[in-house]
């Protein structure tokens, strides 16, 4: 894998993940203040890292440090000589490694808001709470606590229920806090993280998309060389469009974008994508109509994982054929495959989960690229791999992509196929497609499209009884899904008004043949995922 990434250029804060649902927020908060941060599982060995961070943050986690099998960081990280901040479980990890009796189960769990009182001692100890005046409202979420103050530390913060809510080493830049500065429930948490990253670690605030573009273009040119050809899939979504435009800026027409019509696209999608990518953005694009192949292969397939695997495999078949055609008419061999993987995709793949199982195969990570690399000898290039969604949108703006396209909701690679529950047929896809068009059109007309992270209509073919035209009908169910999110790692349902949903439901039932009922999915992520399958 092409693996020259920003930690080789930008000062980087390493976040070691112990399994907290909030860990990715630490990385996001740091990047928001233009400090590059990277998250790795707590099982990471320093010897395998290959680069030196400016500082280390130990995340929270659901475990008890004193229990057998609890995760612990590689001791070598503590000998690296860089500042360390332990958050919640991370604080307990710092204390426990100094003495096993320092951490015990609390007599009362502490969840929610608390008021923290800071204590000043002078010198580096006070830097963590610099520019934070008075009591600090913090968010607690822990059951265990420190029984003893570790030897060599000061207590620099207390709450009503936490005697050691914040600690700092007397001589070394090592800090621990029992609360979560990364969540919005800790209003001044961003300032605290800035104090650590910038004030204590000395990280330069140079992480911007303007800086990233120039360096990434040079990286791409160096990897691909003066004659190399790159093949990439595009869908018209933000991620693939931004990745394609970046590649075009780097190597021009030696980048070959391929849009595969799998028969499961949105209404008039291929025509719109072709117009935008070719005419507006100058991207070298080929459109392949493979709808019949996909729909024929999906016949009789009900299992979501099998659907994903078939779609991924069929995409490879199409790409391999297209690569041969491109090679035949170009001056160089196609050696590279572009994939629009984002950092949340990577995080979901590498987060520390203990013995947990894979929820579902992610359509942007793994299979497709692996088969291309193994079977066709292509090398993988992922220019967006280290970016969050908001960073990709900003990158798109920097590249001159229109605000409408940059702000477009995500669309999955398998398309409507994973928005039709169970077996996929042309008729079912068309029902979901028409309902989705109505739903999205009405959202745009209401002026709330940009408030929503993602929205779509899906089809549940279980069917329900209804009455239409004074007759009993037995027809399909449309499921509406719309979420609010900043990073797609967590999400909440968008709070539409009853009147709006009623109007959407009326239009769908009246205008989409074969549908008699419309439901709104009010599930957050977690426990639900954003897509249905």
Swiss-Prot record:
Pathway the protein takes part in: Purine metabolism; GMP biosynthesis; GMP from XMP (L-Gln route): step 1/1
Occurrences of domain Glutamine amidotransferase type-1 (ranges): 12-206
Class in the EC hierarchy, top level: ligase
Keyword Cytoplasm: yes
Keyword Nucleotide-binding in annotation: yes
Signal peptide: none
Cross-referenced SUPFAM superfamilies: Adenine nucleotide alpha hydrolases-like (SSF52402), Class I glutamine amidotransferase-like (SSF52317), GMP synthetase C-terminal dimerisation domain (SSF54810)
Pfam family, one: GMP_synt_C
Main subcellular location: cytoplasm
Residues given in the record as XMP binding sites: 308, 470, 525, 531
SUBUNIT field: Homodimer.
Name the record gives this protein: GMP synthase [glutamine-hydrolyzing]
Organism: Emericella nidulans (strain FGSC A4 / ATCC 38163 / CBS 112.46 / NRRL 194 / M139) (Aspergillus nidulans)
